[in-house]
From Swiss-Prot:
Subunit of the heterotrimeric GatCAB amidotransferase (AdT) complex, composed of A (qrsl1), B (gatb) and C (gatc) subunits. Coiled coil: none annotated. Allows the formation of correctly charged Gln-tRNA(Gln) through the transamidation of misacylated Glu-tRNA(Gln) in the mitochondria. The reaction takes place in the presence of glutamine and ATP through an activated gamma-phospho-Glu-tRNA(Gln). One of its GO terms (molecular function) is glutaminyl-tRNA synthase (glutamine-hydrolyzing) activity. One of its GO terms (biological process) is mitochondrial translation. It catalyses: L-glutamyl-tRNA(Gln) + L-glutamine + ATP + H2O = L-glutaminyl-tRNA(Gln) + L-glutamate + ADP + phosphate + H(+). The keyword Protein biosynthesis applies. Transmembrane segments: none annotated. One of its GO terms (cellular component) is glutamyl-tRNA(Gln) amidotransferase complex. This is Glutamyl-tRNA(Gln) amidotransferase subunit A, mitochondrial. Belongs to the amidase family. GatA subfamily. Its EC number is 6.3.5.7. Keywords: ATP-binding, Ligase, Mitochondrion, Nucleotide-binding, Protein biosynthesis.
Amino acid sequence: MLGMSLREAAAVLRLGQVKPTELCQKCLSLIKETSFLNAYITITEDIALKQAAEADKRFAQGKPLGELDGIPIAIKDNFSTAGIETTCASRMLKGYVAPYNATVVQKLFDQGAVLMGKTNLDEFGMGSGSTDSIFGPVRNPWSYSRSYIEKRPISHHAAKDDSDWVIAGGSSGGSACAVSAGTCYLAIGSDTGGSTRNPASHCGVVGLKPTYGLVSRHGLIPLVNSMDIPGILTRCVDDAATVLGMLAGHDLYDSTTVQDPFQPFSLPETIDLSNLCIGIPKEYHAPGLSTEILSLWSKTADLLEKAGAKVMEVSLPHTPYSIVCYHVLCTAEVASNMARFDGLEYGHRSDIDDSTEAMYAATRREGFNDVVRGRILSGNYFLLKQNYEKYFVKAQKVRRLIADDFVKVFNSGVHVLLTPTTLGDAAPYLEFIQEDNRTRSAEEDVFTQCTNMAGLPAVTVPAGLSSRGLPLGLQFIGRAFCERQLLTVAKWCEKQMDFSPLQFNRDLGNGSIVLQYSKSASFV
């Protein structure tokens, strides 16, 4: 049952075949057995069992709260949760307990969701591997799949403490790992430049970044206010659509959310692509793109065309400038947002108290890692009086040009864009950490950050396995607030790929995980 989709599990609960407490206990057991993956920072066992028991009572009375009632979920540890520690994987917030729930968290609780725990991430969401956390890196569960183990150059099977495991992606790596490993049916991540879609692609799950303003950011500890958006990680596109319907809508606590009411939708079972135009951006043939991703991208475009969709090459001419533009704007907002962590009101406070200035400096030196401090320094540099026009203002203008590129393409009749999500499959951890964080992020975010700067919806769908037996994802980008159309196309492609999730098998020992995949989800 742990390999089911959210909607399948919900149906089993409604039929009374399994009780929410039984399902909760199964997930908690699996979390403990796969603890070496380091997906969770905090496991909320007592809270989960209490919430599941309450769901038991509602089902016994025939009054479930909704489709999420009794369903195990996980929340990225940069969302505020009342009474539960929210650390952002940083010493700066270790021990911090928020007095309120983030809006998305509260909406899930209102639907009866059962919280398994808070998931691991790069410190404050600044990274693309989930390797820069004070709680240690997240391991991709596919590191322990038969498909990967059998393709390794070494002959022996992996142990939990070996060095051959691959990264989960980031910064929402813990959330992607939790869903992929079967410890929950839904995880919430955040997406500033690809932080939901990148790990979803590497872990073989669906990752949805909604249109900016469609889902409330209230309670999401901010990184880049103008780009941050809660992300949804599930095992299938239908589940992502279901959850979006629960989370979307105006929030009085977030003035950037749209005023118009959101109409939840379900995706059709029979999908007709004959009236759709799919765009293939030529600028996304980026340096470093693996031949496997390129082949998968091309094959998927052919499948869409054979199904009746019009497929055409399009141009987004300012794409080559986007990653530099993103870096300038991202670090500038980071510098502003991180100023609130000064040791005065909450979070870590240094013992050095010779003066307020000394305490403030020591607190930030002790509380932030090198990556966070580096981004703060970069952002403050771009915001200096002598640099403001030269860098920050110019980057804002380029951002507008990037957004206009998308507007022109969509106004030309294109409905959805098909692109890679990442340059390749997940890198081995020891190889990944050889590069500095900024270089890694530039490489990993190259296909994803444009949609954050343009505020557009995007979803990554698992599309196949690499020659190393690791997941490869493809990204679909839609028009603003056209999530239904976007997810309909994504669901059609998902059906063609028939990608199967990982299934945990205790018989193999060492926390091994085996993959049961169908013929169409084989190696590219």
